Amino acid sequence: MSVELWQQCVELLRDELPAQQFNTWIRPLQVEAEGDELRVYAPNRFVLDWVNEKYLGRLLELLGERGQGMAPALSLLIGSKRSSAPRAAPNAPLAAAASQALSGNSVSSVSASAPAMAVPAPMVAAPVPVHNVATHDEPSRDSFDPMAGASSQQAPARAEQRTVQVEGALKHTSYLNRTFTFENFVEGKSNQLARAAAWQVADNPKHGYNPLFLYGGVGLGKTHLMHAVGNHLLKKNPNAKVVYLHSERFVADMVKALQLNAINEFKRFYRSVDALLIDDIQFFARKERSQEEFFHTFNALLEGGQQVILTSDRYPKEIEGLEERLKSRFGWGLTVAVEPPELETRVAILMKKADQAKVDLPHDAAFFIAQRIRSNVRELEGALKRVIAHSHFMGRDITIELIRESLKDLLALQDKLVSVDNIQRTVAEYYKIKISDLLSKRRSRSVARPRQVAMALSKELTNHSLPEIGDVFGGRDHTTVLHACRKINELKESDADIREDYKNLLRTLTT
């Protein structure tokens, strides 16, 4: 493979990348050919890893196409072109351009004799899985040293080599899950506001809520909505730089950048995106350096009119170990809770998933599953997959009897966890009263209201009849239980404290 082939790829892709991205990641690379192998040198490990993770797929795709199906060998190394014969001497103008690019200075020109650098598709925030590529590491000549090259006469050029054999053209991989869209998101009372806010951001970028902060328990659809926004943004503008990542990835990238003295490249990347989508922001808690860096990144993005979407398992003010200035800024936009789905939504989710799987799910069967799996959408979908698999293996239609067989362990656990006894104990602990108070004839508000809450929870979470529930609450009749349920439903609409208490207890009992 010749350097000319590399240059052809560069010319095809040069216009696809913003100048800042090209200067930061691509221009610092040096290239030389040795036989059928093309050696590409990065100035440090951070740049090498970034090129390998973000750009390799597109780069190999172009090399394969321009090579007319040939299987070229490509080596990524740390260091610079070696000066010993028979290799060509390093190109000084290109090295200078690389140094300027890494320092953030603009590069107006590069010597015409300097090998051009390749550029792939837009960056994403996680390693690109490379399929059909055989990768192996060779021993490095030396460990990475930021001071390498300070004295070229004292030490030979250093390189850590990774050889990549191409077996056909590769497709660029996106880390937005393409299956998560607004079209297949099941909307209900529990997520209606969150869905509406996410759509506003996706359909009117830079004019919606910024930041958009979604919070709630696991498996409730926060990540689905986040991916749906990203996918819609890219649908409207395929050239948009939309980055989705988990907060731990942000921390890992920052640590790597600090270790390799490449924090400026890290900052330039994360502050140049059009939309930054970070999942599970609570993992920043008690990570002071990460919070410091994210604080400045967050400010830079909002000042530049770029969209930020965050998720957490709790309300931002409740995240312990998170700096107050971050909590305050998260409140600049819109904060929306995603609640556990109500019965009707759970049934709708099951019916939609069954339809997507081309499976006939009777409505009474969906209702049976939805009544018993209440905690989150993820567990609901998992239960449905088990039922479908059982139906397929047994060669039987889906019925309530088959559901009982396939989910017997899960249903037994649910019945054990969500018993009236457990509800009484949990409610008593929550309100700091005794179980005997719930069963007593006392009518003081401090006891009567928790008793009504416990009765309402018992009706919603168990299969007991109203008379059975009344019997275990001190021998009360079914009309008392019915009145308690109606009263709590009314208070949930008008009393924020009762609504929050009920939600917390429901989450505790079903998670």
Curated annotation (Swiss-Prot):
Residues 133-160 are annotated as: Disordered. Coiled coil: none annotated. CDD domains: AAA (cd00009), Bac_DnaA_C (cd06571). ATP binds at residues 219, 221-223. Residues 1-87 are annotated as: Domain I, interacts with DnaA modulators. One of its GO terms (biological process) is regulation of DNA replication. InterPro entries: AAA+_ATPase (IPR003593), Chromosome_initiator_DnaA (IPR001957), Chromosome_initiator_DnaA-like (IPR020591), Chromosome_initiator_DnaA_CS (IPR018312), DnaA_C (IPR013159), DnaA_dom (IPR013317), DnaA_N_dom (IPR024633), DnaA_N_sf (IPR038454). One of its GO terms (molecular function) is lipid binding. GO terms for cellular component: cytoplasm; plasma membrane. It comes from the Bacteria. Residues 392-511 are annotated as: Domain IV, binds dsDNA. Residues 175-391 are annotated as: Domain III, AAA+ region. Keywords: ATP-binding, Cytoplasm, DNA replication, DNA-binding, Lipid-binding, Nucleotide-binding. It is found in: Cytoplasm. Residues 134-144 have a biased composition (Basic and acidic residues). Residues 87-174 are annotated as: Domain II. Oligomerizes as a right-handed, spiral filament on DNA at oriC. Domain I is involved in oligomerization and binding regulators, domain II is flexibile and of varying length in different bacteria, domain III forms the AAA+ region, while domain IV binds dsDNA. Plays an essential role in the initiation and regulation of chromosomal replication. ATP-DnaA binds to the origin of replication (oriC) to initiate formation of the DNA replication initiation complex once per cell cycle. Binds the DnaA box (a 9 base pair repeat at the origin) and separates the double-stranded (ds)DNA. Forms a right-handed helical filament on oriC DNA; dsDNA binds to the exterior of the filament while single-stranded (ss)DNA is stabiized in the filament's interior. Belongs to the DnaA family. This is Chromosomal replication initiator protein DnaA. The gene is dnaA.
